[in-house]
Design a protein with these regions (language model features):
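Conserved substrate/cofactor phosphate-moiety recognition/catalytic segment
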Residues: 28-70
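Conserved lysine of the Walker
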Residues: 23
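Glycine-rich phosphate-binding loop used to anchor ATP phosphates in small-molecule kinases
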Residues: 62-104, 112
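Small-molecule kinase domains that catalyze NTP-dependent phosphoryl transfer to phosphate-bearing small molecules
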Residues: 125-167
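Hydrophobic anchor at the beta1->P-loop junction of P-loop NTPases
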Residues: 15
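Conserved phosphate-donor/acceptor-positioning beta-strand/loop module used by diverse small-molecule
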Residues: 103-123
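Extreme N-terminal, non-catalytic leader segments
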Residues: 1-11
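P-loop (Walker A) phosphate-binding loop of NTP-binding proteins
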Residues: 18
Length: 187
């Protein structure tokens, strides 16, 4: 992957965290607030990954590589089309984030950080998600919190989602929504 021209302005955000941290909710609300494109990383999972998780089996790295590369392709398509976008993706390990962000200086990481007890309660309350609460322990075990060199925007998940979104917008130093020229970038 070749390095891009450094910039402080994000063109794509990767909203990361364990299952139940609020990635999809926050990313969708943030995309609406900024008028940016939105994709949920779950939409990129091949059927076999979804079936595996539905049966309570944690994914391994071999399951994740094609999924991560599909998301990285969306990130590049969004950037190269001149749009701005947000993708919700667990991105638990540094090696996963390297695939998604790498040397792309205009792709920023938003880390939704939360206490395991709070997140367990959230996951237990969800009825319509393919990932069962039993897999949450494996997500926390796999989590490698982002380090300063990854330039994360770290946000605690306890506040109301609207408050979280406004905090992210302030930390990004975005005065006005940039907007996007399309509803969704090509996959």
């Amino acid at each position: 992957m070749k390095a891009d021209t450094p910039t402080d302005k994000a063109s794509v955000l990767v909203v990361m965290g364990v299952s139940g941290s609020g990635k999809s909710t926050i990313a969708a609300m943030l995309a609406h607030r900024l008028h940016w494109l939105y994709e949920d990383g779950d939409w990129f999972h091949p059927k076999k990954n979804i079936e595996k998780m539905h049966h309570g089996e944690p994914l391994n790295d071999e399951d994740r590589w094609p999924w991560l590369h599909a998301i990285a392709d969306w990130i590049d398509a969004t950037r190269h089309s001149g749009n701005h976008g947000i993708v919700a993706c667990s991105a638990l390990k540094r090696s996963y984030r390297q695939i998604l962000i790498g040397d792309r200086r205009d792709v920023r990481l938003v880390y939704l950080k939360g206490d395991q007890d709070l997140i367990e309660r959230r996951v237990a309350a969800r009825a319509d998600h393919f990932m069962p609460p039993a897999l949450l322990d494996s997500q926390f075990a796999a989590l490698e919190e982002p380090t300063a060199d990854e330039r994360p925007i770290t946000i605690l998940v306890a506040p109301h989602p609207r408050e979280i979104v406004e905090t992210i917008v302030k930390k990004l130093n975005i005065d006005e929504p940039v907007g996007s020229s399309a509803d969704r970038a090509p996959r």
